[in-house]
Amino acid sequence: QTWNNSYLLDINMIDKQHMHFFKIFDQLLVLNKNFENYLALAPLIDELEKYTKVHFKTEEALMVKANVQDIDLHIAQHEIFIEKIDAFKTAYSYQNTVLLEQMIIFMRKWFLMHISEVDRKYAEPVQKYLEKREIKEM
């Protein structure tokens, strides 16, 4: 399932980052289907790892500034996803294309659930925080 606008949180920088994740997942799935492209997966896996860490730091910083409740639970979910990326890298290092495809699909589903159920909970307080900040800067 690719990106659609029902995943938007109406937080511009976060929505753009979420869209970028879907592009990475789409590219990983396409390249993994053809073993000749297997080596091309390495830079995408690195990008996924780096981008995930940047994105999670962005989300977490916004949640702290907006005084979002239950932030510890949210951060714990982020840590679980980062552990999955480590498992993903291990599957890649063993050239296990079946496991790799299962990992890509799992991470994409996890990410989709995380956006639609978990991230959505912080959207309103972060939007209010950003609106107040914009008013102060005017």
Name the predicted role of every residue range.
Residues 1-138:
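Small-residue-biased structural context
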